[in-house]
C-alpha cells in the first residue's frame, strides 16, 4: 500500500489547496524526509510528493512544488534536497527493513536493500540534540557506506545547486556502523555508487 499524493497541513488563511505556509522552510524539508522514512518503515511500497514542481492546475498556481515556477527561475526549495537525496538512493523493487527506535523518539530510520544487494539507510533526527546510534545488520557486517547529510545550514542557498555532496565515508567497526546524528538533520548512508 502507499499514498498517491502527500504534503503538509500548514494551510494558508483563508485555506487554499494551492498554497501552504511552510513551502519555503527547512521545517518542510524535515517533514518530507520523516514522512518518507516513516511511511517506508510502516510498510508503504510507494509514495508521491504533491506537486513535484509548481504548475498551473485548473487555472490556479499550485505553489507547493519541490521547485518554484519559471518566473522564479525554477528555484529549488529546501524539501527538494531531502526528497531528492532519499529518492536518489532508494531503488525500485528494494526490500524494506523496518526498525525499532522506540528509545529515540526524535529519530526515525529505515533500511533498504536493492536487487543487487546494496544497502541504503535513511535516518532523520527531528530533535534539538544529537543522537548516538549503532546500526547492526547481519547482512552488512563489514565494508563502508557513503554518508550524505542535510541540515538547515547545509542546504545550498542559491536555489540552483542540484544535489547534496557526500560528506564522508563511514565504516563498519566490530559489526556496527556507529553514528552521530546531528540535531534537526537527515542522513542517508549507502553503498550504492553515486551517479
Residue ranges of model-derived segments:
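Aromatic/acidic polysaccharide-binding cleft in carbohydrate-active enzymes
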Residues: 3, 7-109, 115-116
